[in-house]
């Protein structure tokens, strides 16, 4: 940022600043959610600036550690409502501690309030002694124009149950053990399994589709019956929310934020060996479980973000 850019920014105004390194999809879940949130706010006529904080902009949302913190520090000033959206704990989620969570706590010192994405995330931060300023929980959501159920549900009859799982990250904690077990042990005469995204694994019987942009991903999700959420210690899986948003009940690992996101819209499991029974039960209860799905509407989530940013 040049000095002239900085001086020019002091004279401007937007309704809200967002600090996050945005990427075109396909990309990670936090990026997907923030793209949807920004689009919802813009649809409402709220003016948003990205990675700058003009002199008369009254509020700023900054995301986890995915931005230039030194830039934010330079722009920050008294009188701006600062809200920090926090993921993780990152060390638990990734399976190793590289100091990122400590850095997030340091960055959090600028915040007037902190948004965490699940009760699990809030409680896990507290358990680890990671104190965040004025925390509140707001689940993520999805863009309903893209991730919505199909118009009609055809009865399965004797067809195989179509199971899908997705992941942008190829971290093994995204469910690699579960997928390996399914590839070797599941009855593929009764089930078909699709993985969409990035993986380091080679499968013999699971179909693999590369990373997809949002619309083709949603179309692929709607061509299936059940979503498999096998990631471990995932605070608020956007992949899971996208599957639920497309009307797919979930078979979910009882870990992280999965149970609070799914509720009665799926069946939990603790080990891969339980999945054949879970899939069989979901097949029998498909209509009932689909009807129980609840994803917080994007409009409601945006309202809660705005409330936090305006207090």
Q: Where does each model-flagged region fall?
A:
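Active-site proximal beta-strand in glycosyltransferases
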Residues: 59-61, 74-92, 115
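Short alpha-helical donor nucleotide-sugar binding micro-motif in glycosyltransferases
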Residues: 108, 219-224
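Carbohydrate-associated surface elements
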Residues: 120, 141
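A charged, aromatic-enriched C-terminal amphipathic alpha-helix characteristic of glycosyltransferases
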Residues: 152, 284-311
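Conserved donor-binding/catalytic core segment of Leloir-type glycosyltransferases
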Residues: 154-174, 180-184
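Aromatic "clamp/platform" in nucleotide-sugar-dependent glycosyltransferases that forms part
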Residues: 232
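Short hydrophobic beta-strand element within catalytic cores of glycosyltransferases
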Residues: 245, 249-252
